[in-house]
Amino acid sequence: MSEELQREKESQKTRVGRNVLVTLATQLVSWALTFAVTLFLPRYVGDTGLGNLAFADSFVVIFGVFVPLGTSTVLVREIARDQSRAGNLLATALLLRLPLGLVMGGLAVGAAALLHYSALVQLLVLVAASGMVVASLNDALASTLQGQENLTRQSAAVLVEKFLFSGLTIFLIFSRAPLWALASVTLLTGTVSLAVNASAFRRLLPGLRLPSLAEVRTLVIAGTPFMGWIVFRTLYSRTDPIILRLVTSAATVGWYAAASRLVGTSLFLPAAITTALLPALSRLHGTDSAAFRQLVRRMLGIVMMCGIPIALVLMLVPGQLIALLHYPPSFQHSIPVLRVGGLAVLLYYAAMVLGTAVVASDGQNKMVRASMIATLVSIPACFAGAYFGEVYWKNGATGAILSDAAVEAYLVFSYLRMLPAGTLIGENLVFLGRCTAAALPMAAFLELMSRSRTGVWILLPCAAIYGIMCLILRCISTQDIAMVRQILAKRA
């Protein structure tokens, strides 16, 4: 029996590692495709056009955040613990989201008209609202696949969507398409991704039945704590473009959006790892607390080891990044935003990992309070940051992202306090110290070379320097290397 248990544990470790690699590979390809759009879109639409796109997207997100009612995490966690419930939970989630999505989308369109936004912005809101309904349904399918740990199919849908999105967007840019056509690409590619994910559930269809109102109510109640956390978290993170437009101008929103896109592309790593490990963490929390703590530590260590050099690049050579992308001169205003964004990257990375660990350990009720405080503080802080940034620096976007970084630091501190006792230990601080020490030679080289007229090619020797220092200081575990080799050998 003990041998069977040991084999089962080894199988789970291999599955977890495989899921991490599959998701990470998917996110790497997605990053490259997203970067291609980031390369061309600001050049074509300019700061004002990019600001209008970002504003419409954030405006609709404020309404769309209420559609899932916090059920996405419920689907992942409950299905990971009992996969026989997948069909019933998925049907209930879809029945809940479709009417809510239509209602909230209609409210977003109506609100844009009542607020007398320009005809262009109203059209962009209509397109974004339609895409929001599709995305909400697709999210239910993706969450179910994540709970089943079927990340291969979920990754296939993501890749199809990203390939289509990047290809169509770039084609429309070179075709000189209007702004609303560019916004419509998200709706089209989201529909294709929905179809790909839905094809994974063909065998479940014969057994599906219409959920009862009691089942819908049970799912809503289970999602309520997550809904509070997600709603407050979204309001905190997505209101900046709206506030900036109120305080400054569409061009300033564009500077902020350009920097946010570059910072956002760096978040593929924690997104990949937390997506892959949430089901395993949810399962381990109820069955093996020691393994749960160990997995959280390794997850945080890997993410922060990769986040430190990315943060340094954004802080030290943002001008070279803007020059590489050949953005119009007006986007020079994004450089100070990127410098602050580099510091914020470390906080974003830590918050994503710690938040995932708290959710897996059933601590979502505690997260609601922290997210509520963050929202109540962040909105006036963003107003103040945007206003004073505009007055003193002629750049409200810098003040806005400074307020974001401050609130993110509060969330990281809050999540640390919510973790089960003994999850993180002094060894984690020592590891972060080693990673920081490994990054110092890279930072010195980067700072030295950035003073001369060098291109972004300097990132290649920087990566080599950091990698060598990580090996010397033992930031990379031999256990991790062995696991990767084992997974790759089995796949071969």
Indicate residue ranges for each PLM-predicted region.
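Interhelical loop/hinge segments that connect adjacent transmembrane helices in multipass membrane
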Residues: M1-Q12, V16, T152, L179-W180, ...
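Hydrophobic transmembrane helix module of multi-pass membrane transport proteins
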Residues: S2-L5, V60, L96-R238
